[in-house]
Curated annotation (Swiss-Prot):
Residues 1-106, 164-178, 222-234, 292-363, 419-426, 481-492, 547-602 are cytoplasmic. High-affinity uptake of maltose and maltotriose. Also transports alpha-methylglucoside, glucose and turanose but not melezitose or trehalose. It is found in: Cell membrane. The chain crosses the membrane at residues 107-127, 143-163, 179-199, 201-221, 235-255, 271-291, 364-384, 398-418, 427-447, 460-480, 493-513, 526-546. Its main location: membrane. GO terms for molecular function: alpha-glucoside transmembrane transporter activity; carbohydrate:proton symporter activity; maltose transmembrane transporter activity. The keyword Transport applies. This is Alpha-glucosides permease MPH3. It comes from Saccharomyces cerevisiae (strain ATCC 204508 / S288c) (Baker's yeast). Residues 582-595 have a biased composition (Basic and acidic residues). Induction: By maltose and maltotriose. Repressed by glucose.
Length: 602
């Protein structure tokens, strides 16, 4: 770690003589903080306090001054080290943090699985005959568009409620216990789905299961971003997208098996519901032993617990590990303190819209996640149903869905490689551009009724899935964790995910009307609509979405505070830890307040 040996030696010197402070002794009365020129040249930016040669112990004011600036120095050092840390070093230093993050994010496998089987049920013959109605014109059985819309609305409404409950729950008991409670309720609510005998029971079960799903959506992203360093942030936040895909792939495989072996048996839809009981218990046990987010602990003033939590995420032993823990805690303290000075209130949902800075951060986070719906990804979730309505056989529709999710997994892994060469914004925008082109081609093929055009539109939807999971799908999970301030991160992510859910409800209604033979019956021609909407999302990204690749949370805070435009985020360099020399007429009665105010002004 950069300058780590210096910091270890500096701390040893400080503890050996409590009267000695970083800097040079002068033969005059105590003066305000000055920066040592040689230290500047060394790149260490160590602030020191000048004092008289009196052998008496330093005054309480000087102690406070030194403590504050030591914390600021440590915060700066931790921030610089995090920004310059290579991937291999990060994995070697934070292996346990990565493992805990992967465990927590695995809860999203269940949400990806649960939401995917619902869309696949609409193409399952036994489900259609059990809960659907027969089309008088075609003689085919299908679930009515109104019920499809209703079931979608139920689980999304449940997610919205669950997300809103997540905020106060996290404030009260933290991330770990909130996730464990959500897993318990998910296992309990699954009984309703397994024993369903009507669409009404399925609607109730979906609404109740949606509440823990909403919790998973928020906390997996915020936990991954807070427990891991910058070098691992993209990989561990975008792993959430992989978990979604693993769940959807698992669902597609189970549904294909149900279509082949249980086409005329109630096990065709009961077995997929029952498999939801596999993960909650082992995941709850694992999360119980996971460390709490150090950011949450520092916000609660539980600094010793934050240090213990950080020790559990780091490898190695000895003074280097302890120094790294101290640096990180000091950085978190300084970051949160600077954010608190922007408002006198505790973090609440209203704070997300309180001033121009937070309004901008909230807007970008919400629209960024809403882009996952407006880019046409909801159509991918109904891919099996889409393939059927495009003229592909039921068996081939399920096969196409499996291929589609496999391509999505490969694309997400490819995005990890691409993130080394392209920024967050680049992947988001390029993905949208490619999807726009492919959607227009799908719409054009929908104007033809030949077998080749039907197979072509189905194949191109797989191309949409590939570009979606290469660009916008994974990168959104990283962006929404970086845009909010640390103090409002959980609440901003909740608002953003609920924005996504509301937009998804609208998009789902449109898709079901577009594909249902009793409604608009657009089929593949719906590609034109989603191509236009995807292009509009691309225009917003170009105008409003900042580039945050390579930026630490402290730097992002400073860039938003300075009002840097979206397209200049990448090139603008800031130093959030520069400390101004206070004016001569400043009061020395409260040195802590004066100095902290000076720091906050930066």
């Amino acid at each position: 770690m950069k300058n780590l040996s210096f910091l270890i030696n500096r701390r040893k010197e400080n503890t050996s003589d409590s009267n000695v402070y970083p800097g040079k002794a002068k033969s005059h009365e105590p003066s305000w903080i000055e920066m040592d020129d040689q230290t500047k040249k060394d790149g260490l930016d160590i602030v020191h306090v000048e004092f008289s040669p009196d052998t008496r112990a330093p005054s309480d004011s000087n102690k406070v001054i030194t403590e504050i600036f030591d914390a600021t120095e440590d915060a700066k050092e931790a921030d610089e080290s995090e920004r310059g840390m290579p991937l291999a070093t990060a994995l070697n230093t934070y292996p346990k943090a990565a493992a805990w993050s992967l465990l927590v994010s695995t809860t999203l496998i269940m949400e990806g699985y649960d939401t995917a089987i619902l869309g696949a049920f609409y193409a399952l013959p036994i489900f259609q005959r059990k809960f659907g109605s027969q089309n008088d014109k075609t003689g085919e059985w299908e679930i009515s568009a109104s019920w499809q819309i209703g079931l979608t609305l139920c689980y999304m409404a449940g997610e919205i409620v669950g997300l809103q409950l997540t905020g106060p729950s996290v404030d009260l008991v933290g991330n770990r216990y909130t996730l464990i409670i959500a897993l318990f309720f998910l296992a309990a609510f699954t009984f309703i789905l397994y024993f369903c005998n009507s669409l009404g029971m399925i609607a109730v079960g979906q609404a109740l299961c949606g509440m823990p799903w909403g919790c998973f959506q928020c906390l997996t992203v915020s936990y991954a971003s807070e427990i891991c360093p910058l070098a691992l942030r993209y990989y561990l936040t975008t792993y959430s997208n992989l978990c979604w895909l693993f769940g959807q792939l698992f669902a597609a495989g189970i549904m294909k098996n149900s279509q082949k072996k249980y086409a005329d048996s109630e096990l065709g839809y009961k077995l997929p519901f029952a498999l939801q009981w596999i993960l909650p218990v082992p995941l709850a046990l694992g999360i119980f032993f996971a460390p709490e987010s150090p950011w949450w602990l520092v916000k609660k003033g539980r600094f010793d617990e934050a240090r213990r939590s950080l020790r559990r995420t780091l490898s190695g032993k000895g003074p280097e590990k302890e120094i790294l823990v101290t640096l990180e805690v000091d950085k978190i303290k300084v970051t949160i303190d600077k954010e608190k000075r922007l408002t006198s209130k505790e973090g609440s949902y209203s704070d997300c819209f309180e001033d121009k800075i937070n309004r901008r951060r909230t807007r970008i986070t919400c629209l960024c996640w809403a882009g996952q719906a407006t880019c046409g990804s909801i159509l991918i979730g109904y891919s099996t149903y889409f393939y059927e309505k495009a003229g592909v056989s039921t068996e081939m529709s399920f096969t196409f869905s499996i291929i589609q999710y496999c391509l999505g997994i490969c694309a997400t892994f490819l995005s990890w490689w691409a993130s080394k060469y392209f920024g967050r914004y680049d992947l988001y925008a390029f993905g949208l551009a490619f999807q726009t082109i492919v959607f227009f081609i799908i719409g054009g093929l929908g104007c033809s009724s030949t077998h080749g055009s039907k197979m072509g539109s189905g194949s191109l939807l797989m191309a949409v899935a590939f570009f979606y999971n290469l660009g916008i799908a994974p990168v959104v999970f990283c962006l929404v964790s970086e845009m909010p301030s640390s103090r409002l991160r959980t609440k901003t992510i909740i608002l953003a995910r609920n924005t996504y859910n509301v937009v998804s409800i609208i998009c789902s209604v449109l898709i079901l009307y577009q594909l249902n033979s009793k409604k608009w019956n657009w089929g593949a021609k719906s590609g034109f609509f989603w191509g236009v909407l995807c292009f509009c999302t691309l225009i917003w990204a170009v105008v409003d979405l900042p580039e945050t690749a390579g930026k630490t949370f402290v730097e992002i805070n400073e860039l938003f505070k300075l009002g840097v435009s979206a397209r200049k985020f990448k090139s603008t360099k800031v130093d959030p830890f520069v400390v101004k020399t206070p004016p001569k007429d400043v009061s020395h009665n409260d040195p802590k307040g004066d100095i902290e105010a000076s720091i906050a002004e930066e």
